[in-house]
Amino acid sequence: MRKTKKISFLIFWVVLISIIGAISSQQCNETGYFEPWKTYDTNRRQILTSLASKVVDHYGFYNSSIGKVPDEVHVMGMCIDGTEPTVCSDCLKVAADQLQENCPNQTEAYTWTPHKTLCFARYSNSSFFKRVGLHPLYMEHSNVDIKSNLTYLNTIWEALTDRLMSDASSDYNASLSSRRYYAANVTNLTNFQNIYALMLCTPDLEKGACHNCLEKAVSEYGNLRMQRGIVAWPSCCFRWDLYPFIGAFNLTLSPPPGSKRNISVGFFVAIVVATGVVISVLSTLVVVLVCRKRKTDPPEESPKYSLQYDLKTIEAATCTFSKCNMLGQGGFGEVFKGVLQDGSEIAVKRLSKESAQGVQEFQNETSLVAKLQHRNLVGVLGFCMEGEEKILVYEFVPNKSLDQFLFEPTKKGQLDWAKRYKIIVGTARGILYLHHDSPLKIIHRDLKASNILLDAEMEPKVADFGMARIFRVDQSRADTRRVVGTHGYISPEYLMHGQFSVKSDVYSFGVLVLEIISGKRNSNFHETDESGKNLVTYAWRHWRNGSPLELVDSELEKNYQSNEVFRCIHIALLCVQNDPEQRPNLSTIIMMLTSNSITLPVPQSPVYEGMDMFLPSIKSLPGSVNDSLIDDLVPR
C-alpha cells in the first residue's frame, strides 16, 4: 500500500511537471511602450486585477476598457468551455500576473495560459474587439519527432484539423460566451495511441474570421511531425498532444489521498531529477521490449481494424434493420438510422449480396475509404462483416439529403440564396478533395442532389463515395461497358462512349448547380411545361436570349444577389460543355465561385446533338442507370 502511494505521488508530479512545461505563451507586442507608474500603467494594473472576477461574472468571457486616449486600456479575457468558476478565476489571475511580469512596459500583449484549464487574457492601447489579431505569433512544439507511418498519420491529421476548424468556427451560439468557437477532439492514431486536439477563437469574431484564423494556424505548422505543440495568435489558438492535457479532456490534478505533508524546494528538485532518470530508463526499456517483440511476434494488426463493428451492435442500433429506421434504398443496398449504446447516431448501409469481395479485401478497401475525411464529405466510421453481411457505418447527417429540400414545395422555402450558395461552394470543395487533395484520386460518377447530405448547419456533405472498391465493380480507369450513374447527370462522353474522368464529375456538378438555382430536377424536366428538352437546354436558351435570371427559383422572390446568381449560372454552363477539355476543373471552379476578379470564358452551346437517340431509354428509367453510387479510385 505504501509503495502504491509512492508511485501515485510520483505520477502526480510527472503529470504536473509535463503540464507546467507544455506551453507558456505570453507574447509581448514590441510595437509600443509606456512609462512605468504613469497613467497607462495604473489603468493596466487596475483592469487586469479585476479581469478574473469579471470573466466569471460574465459566464466565461468578458471585454472592456478603462481610461481615456492616450492612456486608454482595452482588455479581453476568457476560459474554455466547461471550466469551473473558481478554476477559471485562478487561471486568469495567473495569466494577468504573467502579462504584467513578462511584459513590464509593452502597450499590447496576450497570453494563452494553461493553469488547471486553458484561459486567455489580452490588453492593448487600441480597440481590438471584433478584429482578427494575427500578430505576434506564438508557436511551440516538443523536440520529439514522429518518424514512422507519416503518410497514414498525416491523413488522420488533415481530417482532424478540417473537422476541428469546421466545428470550432460554427456559429452555433449567438451569445458572446466561451461556448462559442470552441472544439476539442480525440482521434485514434493506432489501437493504443490517440491524438488530442483543441481549437478555439475569441467569441467576438465573425464565423468566417474565426475559420480563417484557425486555417492559418494549421497551415503555419504544416503536417503532423512532433508529438505535441501549440500555435497561437491574439484571436485564436490550436493545441494538440499525443496525451490528454488539462482542462479540455476532463483531467484532474489532485494529490493522492494521504499526501498532505509540505514539500520542500530541495525535495521538489529531487523529484524532478528522479523523474527525468525514470523516464529515460523506462523509455529505453520500452524500446528494447518492443524490438524483442517485433522479432518474436507476428506483425500487429493495422490500426484500420479498429474500424470494425460487430453485427450485434449494428442490429441493436437499428432495431434489427427495422423498416421504421430505413432512411433510403439504392442499388448497393438499404440505409438505416442507428443509435449506439452511448447515444451517438449513425447511418448504416447494408450492402446487397452481390458484392464479390472477400473478407480481407473488404476490410482493406473500407479502411482506405475511411481515411478520406473532409468537412464536406460524409464520414465513414467503420464496417461490419459477419457471415453474408457486409455493412458500412457512416456519420449520421440530420437534415438528410438536398433533394428533400430542393424539390419539395413545402421545404424549399428553407433554402434561401445564402444557403444555396453555401451548398454549391461546399459541394465543390468536397469534390475537389476527392479529385486532387485526398490520398487517392476519386471520380464520384454519381454526383446528384440525393447524394448531397445537409448537416444541422445546412453545410453540404458529399455522400456515397468510395463504393466502387468496396463493392468491387468491374471497371477500368478510363472507360467501362457498364454505364453507371443517374440519368440527367451523366456526361455525354460517358453515356455514349463509356469514357469517364474528373470532367465527368464536373458535368454532374454543373447540372446540380442549375438544379440548386432553379429548384427543378433535370431528370424529369421533360415532364414540365418549360421550353427545352432538359434543364441544361432550358438554361442555355435563357442565357442565349439574355434572360438567365428567368431560371431562378420563384421561391427566392428576388431575395438574392443578381451578380452572384448570374455568375453561378455562367459557371454551371461552363461545367456542362460538350467537350470535356472545355470544362474547368474543380480548383478553377472554386476560384471562379469565390473571386469576382477572375474573368470567365464565354460558354458554348451545351446541346449534344447525338444525345437524342439515347434520351428515350434514359427517360424510361425510374431513377438512374444504376441507382447506386459508383466511383473510381486510383492510388496516387
Curated annotation (Swiss-Prot):
Extract the Pfam families matched here.
Answer: PK_Tyr_Ser-Thr (PF07714), Stress-antifung (PF01657)
The reaction(s) annotated as catalysed by this protein in its Swiss-Prot or TrEMBL entry are: L-seryl-[protein] + ATP = O-phospho-L-seryl-[protein] + ADP + H(+); L-threonyl-[protein] + ATP = O-phospho-L-threonyl-[protein] + ADP + H(+)
Annotated positions of the Phosphotyrosine modification: Y394, Y494
Which segments constitute the Protein kinase domain?
321-600
Residues where Phosphothreonine is found: T486
Instruction: List UniProt keywords, sorted A-Z.
Output: ATP-binding, Glycoprotein, Kinase, Membrane, Nucleotide-binding, Phosphoprotein, Receptor, Repeat, Serine/threonine-protein kinase, Signal, Transferase, Transmembrane, Transmembrane helix
- Give the binding site residues for ATP: L327, G328, Q329, G330, G331, F332, G333, E334, V335, K349
Q: Which SUPFAM superfamilies match?
A: Protein kinase-like (PK-like)
Where in or outside the cell is it found? Answer: Membrane
List the stretches on the Extracellular face of the membrane.
Answer: 26-266
Please tell me one Gene Ontology term that the record gives under cellular component: membrane
Q: Which residues carry this modification: Phosphoserine?
A: S450
Example of a GO MF term: ATP binding
Q: Which residues lie toward the Cytoplasmic compartment? A: 288-636
Q: Which residues are glycosylated?
A: N29, N63, N105, N125, N149, N173, N185, N188, N250, N262
Q: Which residues cross the membrane?
A: 267-287
Indicate the residues that form the catalytic site.
D446 (proton acceptor)
Q: Report the leader peptide range.
A: 1-25
Q: How does it sit in the membrane?
A: Single-pass membrane protein
Q: Which residues form the Gnk2-homologous domain?
A: 26-128, 138-245
E.C. number: 2.7.11.-
The family note in this entry says:
Belongs to the protein kinase superfamily. Ser/Thr protein kinase family. CRK subfamily.
Return the protein name. Putative cysteine-rich receptor-like protein kinase 33
What species is given as this protein's source? Arabidopsis thaliana
